[in-house]
Amino acid sequence: DARLSSFLSADKNADDSDRDAFLSGQMIDLQGRLNVANLIDGNAISESGMAGFSRLFATLGLPSAELTTMAAQLLRASQNSNPPTNQGPTQPLTDGVPDPLMPERVSELLWLGLTPDSLNALSPHITLLPTRTPVNLNTASAEVIHAITPGLEMADAQKLVSARQRSPFSALTDAAQISAGRPGQFNESLHSVSSRFFEVRGSLRLDQTTLQERSLVQRDGQTVRTLWRHRGVIADSRGTAP
């Protein structure tokens, strides 16, 4: 954290008796996580996406039924948000269950059938991006690398994490040489060594209250776009969530 007063020291009217406020910031590589959007491919559930998430659920000891429900609900939400142009208006549902809304953030996956406990376990390992993305082997955890790579043992995933700390991968062939897995184990549809999507977090803390702003940004070459931004108080003066 940095004191806000350090940025305002040139202000002759600054009052030293004022309470200290602190600024902090963080950038997270979201392509170091499994992307929930990969569960859908066009107008169907993705076989490779389900395989990766199934391995992650198994590693974390989570019920596979929740994954099945989440994928089905995500497909339903996607179809409702982007109905085929040749089918006309969406027809009313006959099962009495309203269409789920299309989530924008990981916290909103509760809408699709995840329990709070499962969401808490998954949150460090997953993201929700507007398009399908490969996993960046330079920033993903061993759990994510193991999940996204068919046939890769957890020990080999941990070996990759250790190797990149000494020398980041510049190509997928670098990872293949270390893992010594089967040919084609690392491919551009599932893996990468660079990223386009990041979350930028900024916080302002005063006493026990923290105001946090989170933004999803997309970088393409020298062009950076903000796709969404959310701001809110994450703790009150009693140290509890608002």
Residue ranges and their predicted role:
Residues 1-242:
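Compositionally biased linear targeting/interaction segments
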